UniProtKB/Swiss-Prot annotation:
The keyword ATP-binding does not apply. It holds the Pfam family Queuosine_synth. The gene is queA. One of its GO terms (molecular function) is S-adenosylmethionine:tRNA ribosyltransferase-isomerase activity. Transfers and isomerizes the ribose moiety from AdoMet to the 7-aminomethyl group of 7-deazaguanine (preQ1-tRNA) to give epoxyqueuosine (oQ-tRNA). Gene3D superfamilies: QueA-like. This is S-adenosylmethionine:tRNA ribosyltransferase-isomerase. It is found in: Cytoplasm. Keywords: Cytoplasm, Queuosine biosynthesis, S-adenosyl-L-methionine, Transferase. HAMAP family: QueA. PANTHER family: S-ADENOSYLMETHIONINE:TRNA RIBOSYLTRANSFERASE-ISOMERASE (PTHR30307:SF0). Transmembrane segments: none annotated. It comes from the Bacteria.
Amino acid sequence: MNTNDFDFELPEELIAQTPLEKRDSSKLLIIDHRQKTMVDSHFDHIIDQLNPGDALVMNNTRVLPARLYGEKPDTHGHVELLLLKNTQGDQWEVLAKPAKRLKVGSQVNFGNGHLKATIIDELEHGGRIVEFSYDGIFLEVLESLGEMPLPPYIHEKLEDAERYQTVYAKENGSAAAPTAGLHFTTDLLKKIEAKGVHLVYLTLHVGLGTFRPVSVDNLDEHDMHSEFYSLSEEAAQTLRDVKQAGGRVVAVGTTSIRTLETIGSKFQGDIQADSGWTNIFIKPGYQFKVVDAFSTNFHLPKSTLVMLVSAFAGRDFVLEAYRHAVDEKYRFFSFGDAMFVN
């Protein structure tokens, strides 16, 4: 298939720049790809789409304040580092600006020298491996000096950084939020659990590759980014029990889908505790092995995420749903509205 097969018209004013005051007051488009139906609703009604005995699977990753602004001690030139992933110990893969000034051995100071980075390797596209030195606990230093790395299409400053975290965010490590989860409130989750739905958590640390556009025409030539995931034995057992009892596995967001389908593909449809790196690219033609339904936000034209939704619900129907969302002025992308896909 061709990348342009997943294009659609999106007026810029529909790209949400700020979150709504109440997380669960966003709109929800409920689609059923078998019945070919679409229903306009609100997110707090997602509970009506869940049955007792289902499992609702959420990604509990937490976004790091991963954008650091510092300077080179020799020239006082300004430097920006964006932390991508922890490679080992105090070493991180980062995206550096301006990268050409940062050769192996270069140093960068942050916060009057409370945090220092030494370049130990050069990668392509402005990537660097750095080693940090600091006093105390790294995450606490990062919390005090770093800024939240908002997506490139959001131009307004975020008043409350916690609004770019899910209410169940726990495991530090993401460069971006698993945005389908931003709609849930603690109260809504309690109501869902009280209905007899199992709340299950996994972890996938979202990388910046999630925003990287597809640069090839032929999808078979696309090089998918890798992200770290983990599913505990307790979570895997719950999901196996749910499946065995005839319940559904309902994923919250594409990161949960990619984790579950990575594991399902690895273990021939079985759900096992597992951790590792995944670069699974789910596109039309893929046979789903674990996920029965899911919620997700509205994604960028020609993105791998639109392709993933199309793999589940069919390209033509998904693009029809997106046209409906545009006509009805749904809000798009990270702080936007949601879709529930049966």
